Amino acid sequence: GEKDKRPFSIASSPCRHEGELELHIGAAEQNAYALEVVEAMKAALEQDGEITIDAPHGDAWVQEESERPLLLIAGGTGFSYVRSILDHCVAQELKNDIHLYWGGRDECQLYAKSELEEIAAKHNNVHFVPVVEEAPSEWAGKTGNVLQAVEQDFDSLAEFDIYI
């Protein structure tokens, strides 16, 4: 019902997902609501059923005319929002430097890490920085809080267009 509605950021970009809606839902054991959403979606898919969604209510877009570098910051499944922005920028071949910082408790929470590393390898203007709070000894990324990692890497953010 109406009281069961929850917001999920859309990860799909109009450039990459024509006719599809991609959501990133953190359905961990401690998040009963997210698990229920995932189970309801699975059941609807298996039974050729329907899921009712409410249209997006946000008003976010990339300032394409800006020549400033972009700083995309996300934690956990909040990555879906910056994923959509990154996809759009890559599809539009924006030349701005793009710095994407994505943080999670541990590496397994960075579920699209290899894909982002591939994107960064293909596009010289894309810089991906994974950040984990709990790192194994062989971890090559940053450790700690994602916002602290950004703070450590930049003296000032005044010259950036920031999406968080």
From Swiss-Prot:
The keyword Oxidoreductase applies. It is an enzyme of class 1 (oxidoreductase). This is NAD(P)H-flavin reductase. Belongs to the Fre/LuxG FAD/NAD(P) flavoprotein oxidoreductase family. Gene3D superfamilies: Nucleotide-binding domain of ferredoxin-NADP reductase (FNR) module, Translation factors. Involved in bioluminescence. It is a good supplier of reduced flavin mononucleotide (FMNH2) to the bioluminescence reaction. Preferably uses riboflavin as an electron acceptor when NADPH is used as an electron donor. Pyridine binds at G75, G76, T77, G78, F79. The gene is fre. GO terms for molecular function: oxidoreductase activity. The keyword Oxidoreductase applies. GO terms for biological process: bioluminescence. InterPro entries: FNR_nucleotide-bd, MRET, OxRdtase_FAD/NAD-bd, Riboflavin_synthase-like_b-brl. Its EC number is 1.5.1.-. It comes from the Bacteria. It comes from Vibrio orientalis. Keywords: FAD, Flavoprotein, Luminescence, Oxidoreductase.
